[in-house]
Amino acid sequence: MNNLKVWLLMAALSAILVLIGGAIGGKSGALLFFLISLGMNLFSYYYSDKVAISMTRSRPVSEEEAPGLYDVVRRLTKRAGLPMPRLYITPSPQPNAFATGRNPAHSAVAVTEGLLRLLNQSELEGVLAHELAHIKNRDVLIGTIAAAFAGAITMISNIVQWGAFFGMGQDDEEGGGGSFIASLLLALIAPVAAMIIQLAISRSREYLADETGARMAGNSGGLANALLKLDSAARRIPMQVNPAASHLFIVNPLSGESIARLFSTHPPISERVKRLNAMAI
């Protein structure tokens, strides 16, 4: 089912790029952006994890730097029958984490500096088990591709809107009116892209990752306590992250910001904690 959603997501986001091309350059623009979208589909499938790592400014971490982190991940992956993912540190004081990659054999888990400082052993195990559950359930590819495409669409929209702004002095015969209309069309692209992301990444996958992760860790209380801590910290400690990648994290890193609601795919923390506590593992 997730493989079908990946292809549907690629097709939908490619269609958005074609619409952008058509708004900019008519049929030739639409054709150009169609070819670009084909290239992006191939790139995002094989390299979207690297895009996600780059968007969050995460860096590789060695076992010498974080032996405790490696120990927990190695123990959990062995228990779950998963290969060892690449591990990264995200330079942010906000405690958070995410997983990325196209399949279990090509996966990565990133944790923030703040997460390693805040959580105790049981809570850290719960968070890492949740991220490994996303890998085990093969949720990470669709989330990572969505982040890569949404980031690209946002960048293209910004470039074209700046071009339209600086071309406002032209008259309609010189194309100024067309550029302005294109910029108005592009202003509608971000909500559409966000809606597609919300449809593609079901909140039920977060609930399933919570449940799978709790069983993997053998303790539902650790993840429940961690979610409460992370949610509280996310409201107090800002995180500089591209909104297009916010859905990758275990809790919304943009809590309290209006744009966070636009891109939010996170179910309420209170409901997630309630379900975990009901498991009583």
Swiss-Prot record:
Transmembrane domains' residue ranges: 6-26, 28-48, 140-160, 181-201
Protein EC: 3.4.24.-
CDD domains: M48B_HtpX_like (cd07336)
Cofactor note: Binds 1 zinc ion per subunit.
First-level EC class: hydrolase
Annotated GO CC locations: plasma membrane
Keyword annotations of the record: Cell membrane, Hydrolase, Membrane, Metal-binding, Metalloprotease, Protease, Transmembrane, Transmembrane helix, Zinc
Domain of life the protein comes from: Bacteria
Cofactor: Zn(2+)
Name listed for the protein in its UniProt record: Protease HtpX homolog
Gene name of the encoded protein: htpX
